[in-house]
Amino acid sequence: MFKVGEKYKIYKNITAELKEKKWVKAVAEHIPEHERFVRFRLHFTNMYGENSSYVESYTMSELTEMMKSGELVRA
């Protein structure tokens, strides 16, 4: 289903205070052998206009729900 190096877009909350959602570029970075979760590196531009990234992991059930709702798409 997911492969290391594949690019995706995730629609997620950027600022918790404003409940603002934006599309964030994501690359599948690591998938363990048991395949229960996928670790993504998320790339975005911060409020100062600088490019930044961080790592976030999602379980397979979370990713399935995100795909069904349209919050996760292939780039």
Give residue ranges: language-model regions.
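Short aromatic-glycine-enriched beta-strand elements
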Residues: E35-R41
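Short beta-strand-centered aromatic/proline hotspots
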Residues: A16-P32
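Detector for intrinsically disordered, low-structure N-terminal pre-sequences
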Residues: K3, W23-A26, F37, Y54, ...
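A short, structured loop/turn motif at beta-sheet edges
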Residues: F2, I31-H34
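A structural detector for beta-sheet-dominated domains
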Residues: Y11, E29, R41-T45
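Short coil-to-beta transition motif at edge beta-strands of beta-rich domains
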Residues: M1-E17
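Intrinsically disordered, low-complexity, charged/polar segments
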Residues: F44-A75
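Intrinsic-disorder/low-complexity loop/linker signature
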Residues: E6, E17, K21, R36, ...
